[in-house]
A protein has these predicted regions:
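Conserved active-site-adjacent core of cysteine acyl-enzyme catalytic domains
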Residues: 1-90, 162-166, 175-179, 187-191, ...
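Noncatalytic regulatory segments and standalone regulatory/sensor domains
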Residues: 29, 41-147, 151-158
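Long non-globular sequence segments
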Residues: 123-209
């Protein structure tokens, strides 16, 4: 880590958010993967920026080791993963970036399971949410999905206006889903999840068909 830091910031991860104790919600985030940027190391302390809204954190090195083991993160390639020595290797145009994004989007839809959202909506309508699901959605997943769809909508505006419109619609629906989850109105939440599935299906058709 010290060697990497001599050449610039270092990305640490995946980390298990449940062990990041500077986050007041950490106790309900065990098993959620995360990444942070370390910009300095001073004796026994790391200085890092966390994109979850925690900038300039001073964290004891030993306090982050448990998160860094990532024992509950399925896709990890071992403990204590990090990336550093970053160098810019190419400067693609905005069109090239869009074309690569479109390719990745298509591949992920083709490789993914179908009708997952519909099945989940049906389960929510029939059974509501258990404690683990409720905590995940209230503190993490729906608000993150809203933000990510909004970012992608902005990116797509110059390349795919219809895709941008659908992504903005998805952002709005995920925002509403967050509120329904807070109210524990599971029939309303299920209805929104069905809507999300329908809009996502239309977005999928733009890239797969």
């Amino acid at each position: 880590l010290e060697t990497f830091l001599s050449n610039g910031p270092v990305v640490l991860g995946p980390l298990d958010m449940g062990h990041l104790t500077y986050n007041p919600n950490h106790t309900i985030l065990y098993g959620v993967d995360h990444f942070v940027t370390v910009y300095a190391l001073d004796g026994q302390y790391l200085y890092l920026h966390d994109p979850a809204g925690f900038a300039c954190m001073k964290v004891a090195f030993n306090d982050i080791l448990e998160a860094w083991k990532a024992e509950a993160i399925d896709y990890k390639r071992g403990a204590y993963s990090m990336w550093g020595n970053f160098k810019k290797v190419k400067s693609p145009s905005q069109t090239q970036i869009y074309q690569e994004t479109a390719r990745i989007t298509r591949d992920r839809y083709l490789d993914g399971q179908s009708n997952v959202l519909e099945y989940y909506a049906k389960a929510v309508a029939e059974n509501g949410l258990n404690t683990e699901q409720k905590q995940l959605h209230q503190y993490f997943s729906f608000k993150l999905a809203a933000v990510r769809n909004l970012y992608l909508s902005k990116f797509l505006k110059d390349h795919d206006p219809e895709g941008a419109r659908l992504k903005e619609e998805l952002a709005t629906l995920f925002g509403q889903a967050h509120l329904s989850c807070l109210k524990e109105d599971y029939q309303e939440l299920a209805h929104l999840l069905y809507q999300i599935a329908e809009v996502d299906g239309r977005f999928r058709d733009l890239y797969v068909n």
